[in-house]
């Protein structure tokens, strides 16, 4: 297997560190988007915006703004997949893992399983956006030409 290009090696420490890094990117960028939106509409920031499934929705202005923040966060996390994961084949895995841990966080925070249909819809859209755009960016990066220098090293 020495001749295989970019062969996959099982490295649990690398995978765990990438999971932690992507969770950090997810919550860090979501916090920035929510802070930006809250600053624009002069609203007070709250952890409920991140972890309460009842806040996301389309019928109220705060719900629409939170939904918009989650969608923008999916686009930001797609860039995180490009810079930190770098493998198109792993984008869906890391995207689902990030959102699974977010589901657990929401469940623990509110002490009930998220049952709002809009929360599930927003999460499904965000998973699709993050995975597809992240995979597109990673595959575009993987398919770049490898520059080869064909000039001789010396003319001796």
Curated annotation (Swiss-Prot):
It is a multi-pass membrane protein. The chain crosses the membrane at residues 13-33, 65-85, 91-111, 113-133. It is found in: Golgi apparatus membrane. Its main location: Golgi. It comes from the Eukaryota. GO terms for cellular component: cytosol; Golgi membrane; trans-Golgi network. One of its GO terms (biological process) is Golgi to plasma membrane protein transport. Keywords: Golgi apparatus, Membrane, Protein transport, Transmembrane, Transmembrane helix, Transport. Belongs to the SYS1 family. Involved in protein trafficking. May serve as a receptor for ARFRP1. Interacts with ARFRP1. This is Protein SYS1 homolog. It comes from Bos taurus (Bovine). The lineage of its organism: Eukaryota, Metazoa, Chordata, Craniata, Vertebrata. The gene is SYS1.
């Amino acid at each position: 297997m020495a001749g295989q290009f970019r062969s996959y090696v099982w490295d649990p420490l690398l995978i765990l560190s990438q999971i932690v890094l992507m969770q950090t990117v997810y919550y860090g960028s979501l916090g920035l988007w929510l802070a930006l939106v809250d600053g624009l509409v002069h609203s007070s920031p709250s952890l409920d915006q991140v972890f309460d499934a009842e806040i996301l929705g389309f019928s109220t202005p705060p719900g629409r703004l939170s939904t918009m923040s989650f969608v923008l966060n999916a686009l930001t996390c797609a860039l995180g997949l490009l810079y930190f994961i770098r493998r198109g084949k792993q984008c869906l895995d890391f995207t689902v893992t990030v959102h699974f841990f977010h589901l657990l966080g929401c469940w623990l925070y509110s002490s009930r399983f998220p049952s709002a249909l809009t929360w599930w819809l927003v999460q499904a859209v965000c998973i699709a956006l993050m995975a597809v755009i992240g995979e597109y960016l990673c595959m575009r990066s993987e398919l770049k030409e490898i520059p080869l220098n064909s000039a001789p090293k010396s003319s001796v």
